[in-house]
Amino acid sequence: MTRYDDLPYRTCVGMMLINERGLVFVGRRAGVEQVDDSYVWQMPQGGVDPGEDTWLAAKRELYEETSVRSIEKLAEIPDWLTYDIPRVVAGRAWKGRYRGQRQKWYAVRFIGEDNEINIANPGDGHKPEFTAWRWEPMQNLTGLIIPFKRPVYERVVKEFASLAGAQAGT
């Protein structure tokens, strides 16, 4: 059996979807990563297929989780951000193959209407990742995410903070 510290990171992407008011999409997560029901909200994220471009993966994942296609790319964090999942969860999450995620993050402007968002029947027939969704001020995101992902969200918010004000016209 592979030791936790020797497990690799799963390569993933994350998307900060910002509306015209400068608010950010968050979804109420349904899944095995939940270790505390207090922190069940997150931004869309998901795995990168072997050989897949990260920007294309991010657009695909956003569509598969929200049905959203009406976006404009605003920014990208050049670094890969990582987090470790708790050891108690590691044996169940991703069938015990990974210790956490290595993520490339993008910020995008949502240029569609809210009725484009469909988490109940997401794009390409994928299983729903979220049970509810809402628009949230960017500064609130770190308090909504599960604690082991919080350092990544702190960095994402710091990197993209200027985009919320620009979107809101402030």
Swiss-Prot record:
GO terms for molecular function: bis(5'-adenosyl)-pentaphosphatase activity; guanosine-3',5'-bis(diphosphate) 3'-diphosphatase activity. GO terms for biological process: nucleoside phosphate metabolic process; ribose phosphate metabolic process. Its cofactor is a divalent metal cation. It comes from the Bacteria. InterPro entries: NUDIX_hydrolase-like_dom_sf, NUDIX_hydrolase_dom, RppH. Keywords: Hydrolase. Residues 8-158 form the Nudix hydrolase domain. A motif (Nudix box) lies at residues 46-67. Its EC number is 3.6.1.-. It is an enzyme of class 3 (hydrolase). Accelerates the degradation of transcripts by removing pyrophosphate from the 5'-end of triphosphorylated RNA, leading to a more labile monophosphorylated state that can stimulate subsequent ribonuclease cleavage. Belongs to the Nudix hydrolase family. RppH subfamily. HAMAP family: Nudix_RppH. This is RNA pyrophosphohydrolase. It comes from Nitrobacter winogradskyi (strain ATCC 25391 / DSM 10237 / CIP 104748 / NCIMB 11846 / Nb-255).
